[in-house]
């Protein structure tokens, strides 16, 4: 799903819209960071949710097939959607997507 934003406001940024309903009240539920070198099978996975930090070497769910990745899980106030915003590094490019 394509990420969409409201109009950019200098100094604040732009509000992210829910990909399901278009609402702008998305709450972070879980944040995941994946760190690894080029094409390595192992790396570091850090997950933050409900005030707790978890660390392991499991790269399952990394939005990047080769390098670093981020996932931000949201809950929408306007609909039952739980979209996941992903940021993936791939061959010098940064890809942003909703899953």
Language model features with spans:
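Short recognition patches in nucleic-acid-associated and regulatory proteins
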Residues: 2-4, 14-17, 23-71, 88
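Non-catalytic beta-sheet/beta-sandwich ligand-binding modules that flank or precede catalytic cores
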Residues: 11
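Cys/His-coordinated zinc-binding microdomains
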Residues: 20-22, 77-80
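Beta-strand-rich cores of mature extracytoplasmic or soluble domains
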Residues: 82-85
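A short, surface-exposed interaction/processing loop segment used at functional sites
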Residues: 89-99
């Amino acid at each position: 799903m394509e990420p969409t934003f409201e109009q950019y406001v200098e100094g604040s940024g732009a509000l992210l819209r829910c990909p399901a309903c278009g609402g702008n009240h998305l709450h972070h539920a879980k944040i995941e960071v994946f760190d690894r070198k080029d094409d390595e099978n192992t790396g570091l996975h850090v997950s933050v949710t409900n005030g707790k930090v978890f660390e392991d070497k499991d790269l399952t769910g990394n939005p990047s097939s080769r390098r670093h990745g981020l996932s931000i899980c949201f809950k929408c106030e306007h609909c039952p959607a739980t979209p996941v915003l992903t940021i993936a590094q791939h061959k010098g490019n940064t890809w942003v997507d909703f899953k």
